[in-house]
């Protein structure tokens, strides 16, 4: 997105801190539109037509919660795409943001459904139905530092919206990045950093 999001994150030379960093959304908008809306929605539509992209997945019994998302969109006068979509997929194809539903089940808080066109090195079809610890398994330090805090956060989460930002540095500015580089990231010479490294951030 082309909004001045860079000022919303705390960049550290040693990398992103391992913390939740949640804040009250307050009067900030939940859904954002910017100059990249048309190309990003076009990319979402293209990805949704490719079954191998796995940009929408759902467990059973998620439609009621997804219909609530549709209602929230309608209350905000958001234009929704037409078609015979699952309501969460319909909502996801209508906005620039990706959308995930987290449900409390016997195994904890699980990823129950998602319209995820812009993953950052993870595959939705491998994570659907898994609890938060399993979803974040590759995140270094998650289980030791964040697992308990995240579960408590979801247990206590009320109707008032909260938000956070994460950030990464990748040698690729593609929005759709489901794969981790084989053998790790390439070594970028210092002379090429400005052209070949990109700060990627997700507003959650």
What are the roles of these predicted feature ranges?
Residues 1-204:
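Extended, well-ordered protein cores
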């Amino acid at each position: 997105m082309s909004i001045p999001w860079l000022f919303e994150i705390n960049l550290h030379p040693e990398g992103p801190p391992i913390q939740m960093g949640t804040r009250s959304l307050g009067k900030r908008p939940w859904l954002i539109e910017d100059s990249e809306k048309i190309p990003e929605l076009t990319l979402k539509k293209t990805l949704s037509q490719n079954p191998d992209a796995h940009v929408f997945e759902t467990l059973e019994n998620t439609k009621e919660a997804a219909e609530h998302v549709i209602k929230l969109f309608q209350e905000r006068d958001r234009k929704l795409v037409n078609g015979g979509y699952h309501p969460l997929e319909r909502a996801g194809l209508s906005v620039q943001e990706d959308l995930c539903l987290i449900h409390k089940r016997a195994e904890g808080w699980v990823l129950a459904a998602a319209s995820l066109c812009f993953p950052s090195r993870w595959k939705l079809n491998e994570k659907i139905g898994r609890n938060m610890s399993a979803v974040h398994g590759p995140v270094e330090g998650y289980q030791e530092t964040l697992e308990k805090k995240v579960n408590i956060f979801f247990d206590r989460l009320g109707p008032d919206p909260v938000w956070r930002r994460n950030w990464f540095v990748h040698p690729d500015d593609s929005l759709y990045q489901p794969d981790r580089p084989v053998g790790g990231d390439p070594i970028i010479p210092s002379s090429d950093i400005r052209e070949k490294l990109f700060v990627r951030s997700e507003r959650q």
